[in-house]
Design a protein with these regions (language model features):
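C-terminal transmembrane helix and the adjacent membrane-cytosol boundary/short C-terminal tail
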Residues: 2-20, 25, 195-206, 210, ...
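N-terminal signal-anchor/first transmembrane alpha helix
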Residues: 8-16, 20-56, 126
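Membrane-interfacial helix termini and adjacent extracytoplasmic/periplasmic loops
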Residues: 23-27, 71, 77, 144-183, ...
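Transmembrane-helix boundary motif in ABC transporter permease subunits
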Residues: 29, 101-133, 149, 203-206, ...
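Short membrane-interfacial helix/loop motifs at transmembrane-helix boundaries
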Residues: 50-88, 150, 154-155, 255-256, ...
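Glycine-rich helix-loop "coupling/hinge" segments at transmembrane-helix boundaries
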Residues: 67-72, 149, 247-275
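Hydrophobic alpha-helical transmembrane segments of polytopic membrane proteins
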Residues: 178-181, 237, 260-296
C-alpha cells in the first residue's frame, strides 16, 4: 500500500499568508499557556525562597535592642562589622577547611569508583548506580545517628581496637568525626556528576592516545582528566556548598566542642536571639556559595 503524506491544506496556507496576525496570535496564546504552566513554580519560589531571602537581607541591617528585640529602624552595618571578630574568623576558617577537606576526600574516593562504573557493561552500570543511591533510601538524620553509634566510646570501632590490644579509638565529638560524617553524606553528590562526565566521554580518544604510545598516566593526564573536568567541578560544587553550611552532621558528631558556621548561625537565631547578626552571617555564607555557583556556570559544567 502506498504511503500517503500529510500535506498542509492550501486554504490554510493562503489564509496564513493573507492574515499574518494569525501566527502572531498563536505565539501569544502559546506564551500565555507557558506562563500559566510556570505560574505555580514561580509562586512557590517567590514565597518560599525569594521572600525569605529578602527578609534575611533586611534583618542583617537591623538593630538589636538590649532586651533582645529586633528593630527595623535605624539600619546600620554593625552586624557586618562583627563578621571580622577573631571568634567568627576562627569558626569560618574551621568550616572552610572542613568543607575543602570533605570535597578533596570525596573527589579522591569518587573518581576511581566513577571511572570503574563508566567502563563497565551497561547492565552492571545500572546496578552500581543503584548501590550509590542506596543511602538516599534512608533518612539523613538516621544515617548520621548511625555514625554516632559507630564512633562512640562504646561503639564497634572502639571495641575492635580494644580487642586488638590497642587503646580504644574515640572519634566522637571531634573534627575527624565531622569529616567522616560529611564525606559519607555527600559522597554520592560527587560520584554521580563524575560518572555522567566519564560516561559521555569519547573513549576512542583514549585509545588513540595509547596507539600513539602514551602510557596510562599520560593518557589520563592528557585526555581523560581534561574531558572529565566538568564533572569534577560540578561534583566539587555540589559537595562544597552543603558542607560549608552543614548543621546536622556537626551538631550530632561534633557536639559542643566543635562549632561550625551552621551551628553558630543557629545559635545566634535561637540561643542568643541576635537575629541581625545571624542574618549577616547567613548573607556572608550565601555570598561564598554564590561565588561557587558562578564558578560552576562559567566552567562549562552546566553542560552536564
Amino acid at each position: 500500500m502506498a504511503k500517503t503524506s500529510m500535506k498542509p491544506d492550501p486554504a490554510d496556507t493562503v489564509a496564513e499568508a493573507l492574515n499574518p496576525e494569525l501566527e502572531s496570535d498563536a505565539k501569544v496564546a502559546e506564551s500565555r499557556r507557558g506562563v500559566l504552566i510556570a505560574l505555580p513554580s514561580w509562586v512557590y519560589l517567590t514565597v518560599f525562597f525569594a521572600l525569605p531571602l529578602v527578609i534575611v537581607v533586611v534583618y542583617s541591617f537591623a538593630t538589636r535592642s538590649s532586651t533582645g528585640l529586633t528593630r527595623l529602624t535605624g539600619w546600620n552595618l554593625d552586624s557586618y562589622r562583627r563578621l571580622f571578630d577573631p571568634l567568627v574568623a576562627q569558626i569560618a576558617v574551621r568550616s572552610l577547611v572542613l568543607a575543602l577537606a570533605t570535597t578533596v576526600i570525596c573527589l579522591l574516593l569518587s573518581y576511581p569508583f566513577a571511572y570503574y562504573i563508566a567502563t563497565r557493561a551497561p547492565k552492571w552500570r545500572n546496578l552500581l548506580i543503584v548501590f550509590v543511591l542506596i543511602p538516599f533510601w534512608s533518612n539523613f538524620l538516621v544515617r548520621t545517628y548511625a555514625w554516632r553509634v559507630i564512633l562512640g566510646s562504646d561503639g564497634p570501632l572502639a571495641q575492635l581496637t580494644e580487642s586488638l590490644g590497642f587503646e580504644p579509638i574515640r572519634l566522637l565529638f571531634t573534627n575527624t568525626a565531622i569529616l567522616i560524617g560529611l564525606v559519607y553524606g555527600y559522597l554520592p553528590f560527587m560520584v554521580l556528576p563524575l560518572y555522567a562526565a566519564l560516561e559521555r566521554m569519547d573513549w576512542s580518544l583514549v585509545e588513540a592516545a595509547r596507539d600513539l604510545y602514551a602510557n596510562g598516566w599520560t593518557a589520563f593526564r592528557k585526555v581523560t582528566w581534561p574531558l572529565s573536568r566538568p564533572g569534577v567541578i560540578a561534583g566539587s560544587i555540589l559537595v562544597f556548598i552543603p558542607s560549608l553550611g552543614a548543621y546536622v552532621t556537626p551538631a550530632l558528631l561534633g557536639g559542643a566542642r566543635t562549632t561550625l558556621l551552621g551551628d553558630y548561625i543557629v545559635s545566634q537565631f535561637l540561643a542568643a536571639r541576635n537575629q541581625p547578626f545571624g542574618s549577616a552571617l547567613s548573607v556572608a555564607v550565601m555570598s561564598v556559595m554564590l561565588v561557587a555557583v558562578i564558578i560552576y556556570f562559567r566552567s562549562g559544567a552546566k553542560n552536564l
